[in-house]
Amino acid sequence: MTSENGAVLAGSASALRADGRLLTKVGAWPVLVVWHEGRAYAVEDRCPHMGFPLHRGTCEAGLLTCHWHHARFDLASGSTLDRWADDTRPFDVAIRDDEVWVSPRASGDEVTRLQRRLREGLEDGLSLVIAKAVLGLIDAGAEPAARRISWPGGRS
């Protein structure tokens, strides 16, 4: 069931609390809803490093760790703690009565994020991060090398 604002009914809050996790789909995205330390969080159920399902991972101290390559993600923001992995997409969660509703979160400027990831990948020599950033920029209609990237220390 989808609400007027695009939120998707993921399941019951009692099931989420009992099982610790729910899986749903919001638009084209598979979504993992996690009950952790008394609160519900939702992130894309695909590790951005290699695409494996995050629902097989572990949660500890507000972090979700991918079961396969151990990439770590902050449950609240989806931000990675590992430079070689990308951030995962976070979703907003609302619990009303005994229903868990999940909706897409405004993600900000995707092109700016991808340009930042390209710069970080180049700085750290991470070819996977570079490739994913370039492909993302092309998909977003941006030219990856169309403008000069400002580098720390004044080099460009």
Where do the PLM segments sit?
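N-terminal pre-ligand scaffold of iron-sulfur
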Residues: M1-A61, L75, R89-R113
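Short, exposed beta-strand "edge-strand" segments with a Pro/Gly-rich flavor and a Y/T-containing core
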Residues: N5-G11, H70, W84, L137-G141
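A residue-identity detector for tryptophan
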Residues: W29, W35, W68, W84, ...
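Short cysteine clusters
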Residues: C47, C66-H69
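Short cysteine/histidine-rich metal-coordination sites, predominantly Zn2+-binding motifs
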Residues: A61-H67, T80-R89
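Short C-terminal domain-edge/linker segments immediately following a structured domain
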Residues: L64-T65, A76, I95-D98, L122-G125, ...
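M16/MPP (pitrilysin/insulinase) zinc-metallopeptidase core fold and M16-derived inactive scaffolds
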Residues: F73-S79
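Mature, well-folded catalytic/scaffold domains that follow N-terminal targeting or propeptide regions
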Residues: V102-S156
